[in-house]
Each structure stands twice: as C-alpha cells, then as structure tokens.
C-alpha cells in the first residue's frame, strides 16, 4: 500500500530535562509542510512523542501514513509496550505509572485515526529528511530556550 503522506519526525533537548524542541516534515505528493515547536522545560522523549503527535494531528482527514522516527523510545513504545500498558490501565509490567502517559494517550488517539506504518531510521546518519526534521527540532529548542531566558514559559 503506497502511503498518502510520508512523515519524518525528531525531538531535541538541551539538558534532559531542559528546554526542548520537536520537528516534523509532512510530504503529500509534491507538497511539503514543516512543523516545529518547543517547551521551556521538558525531556527528549517528550519531544520525540510530541513530534509524532503534532504531525498526525495536523492531518485533516484519515490517511495512509508512513512515519519515520529515529527514536527507539517511540518505535518500541508504539510496537511493543503500548498494548500492555493499555491492558494494565497505563501501568508498566512493574505496576508503576507509565512515564509520559499523557502524550502516549494522545499519540494513541492520533494514530487510530490513520493507517500508520511506523519506520525507524538511524539518526544523525546523513538521511536528508531526518536531518531536516532534526534541524526543525533544534529550531524549536532554540525558540523555547530564548523564551525561557526572556522569562517566558
């Protein structure tokens, strides 16, 4: 099945926790859309999740999606862990609350609107679209860090 939309996502954080950013590139035919944002106090994993969430939520109608991430956390979470978490009421196998469950729940809802083929791509390995997503995440991080330094949230 050929995807209607191809997405590349990335997250970045300066300090973990610290200011962070996320970036996404959405490709539909010949059209591209770039998204980025950031938070003054966050973690790298939260930014990786937010990149995928924002990209999927930006789609106006249900689509066939090929989503590329360099995050093992997102990849393993969506393929291996989420099913057990949901069965256990968002608890880990050790009966502890799932970290970032607010974002995992949001990602779960966003992905269920679409047919998503999740693809892992090696980060910082010269893949053009992954590098562009990384640059967008760093832009979001810079903007969040500047807002934090200026006293904003």
Swiss-Prot record:
EC number, as in UniProt: 3.1.26.4
Cofactor(s) recorded in Swiss-Prot or TrEMBL: Mg(2+)
Cell compartment(s), UniProt: Cytoplasm
Domain of life: Bacteria
Domain RNase H type-1 residues, every copy: 1-142
Residues annotated to bind Mg(2+) 2: 10, 134
Gene Ontology terms: biological process: DNA replication, removal of RNA primer
Note on how the cofactor is bound: Binds 1 Mg(2+) ion per subunit. May bind a second metal ion at a regulatory site, or after substrate binding.
UniProt cross-references to Gene3D superfamilies, sorted A to Z: Ribonuclease H-like superfamily/Ribonuclease H
A GO term, aspect molecular function: nucleic acid binding
PROSITE patterns found in the cross-reference section: RNASE_H_1
GO CC annotation, single: cytoplasm
Record-listed Mg(2+) 1 binding positions: 10, 48, 70
Statement: the UniProt record of this protein carries the keyword Nuclease: yes
Record Pfam families: RNase_H (PF00075)
Main location: cytoplasm
Function of the protein: Endonuclease that specifically degrades the RNA of RNA-DNA hybrids.
PANTHER family referenced in this protein's UniProt entry, alphabetically: RIBONUCLEASE H1
Description of how the protein assembles with itself and partners: Monomer.
Name recorded for this polypeptide: Ribonuclease H
Lineage, highest ranks first: Bacteria, Pseudomonadati, Pseudomonadota, Alphaproteobacteria, Caulobacterales
Gene that specifies this protein: rnhA
